[in-house]
């Protein structure tokens, strides 16, 4: 069992914000709650433009995810831990099929990466 199920996901994509937002809604069968907020039966996702995004830094090293254009803040609700982790892995698989890069940062990242 993990003490904290909060999850941050960095996303590297050329998609504009609206396309990424729509993709996320489709990937998780979510509902738009606010301009940058998606809700589902199992989680809430805040979709953020990364304030640290830096084109020059990105061009120097596109693998440095701290400078990617977007990130997601994900909080679980009303779900068992094991199912939540599976759902996160499914979300990341969906994103990896459409984005240049996806990096997860959380207490259970090794478990998620092992499922993909």
What do the predicted segments below correspond to?
Residues 86-116:
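Acidic, proline/glycine-rich low-complexity IDRs
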Residues 10-15, 75-78, 107-108:
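Structural motif
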Residues 31-80:
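Short, intrinsically disordered low-complexity segments
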Residues 25-34, 92-100:
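A common structural junction motif
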Residues 16, 20, 80-87:
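Short amphipathic alpha-helical segments
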Residues 16-17, 42, 110-112:
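Short, catalytically relevant binding-site loops at active-site mouths
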Residues 1-4, 65-67, 71, 78-82, ...:
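N-terminal low-complexity, intrinsically disordered segments
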């Amino acid at each position: 069992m993990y003490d904290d199920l909060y999850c941050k996901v960095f996303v590297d994509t050329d998609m504009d914000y609206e396309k990424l937002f729509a993709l996320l809604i489709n990937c998780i069968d979510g509902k738009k709650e606010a301009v940058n907020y998606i809700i589902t039966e199992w989680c809430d996702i805040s979709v953020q433009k990364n304030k640290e995004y830096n084109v020059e830094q990105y061009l120097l090293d596109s693998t440095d995810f701290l400078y990617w254009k977007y990130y997601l803040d994900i909080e679980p609700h009303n779900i068992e831990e094991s199912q939540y982790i599976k759902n996160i892995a499914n979300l990341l698989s969906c994103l990896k099929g459409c984005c240049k890069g996806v990096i997860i940062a959380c207490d259970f990242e090794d478990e998620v990466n092992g499922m993909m």
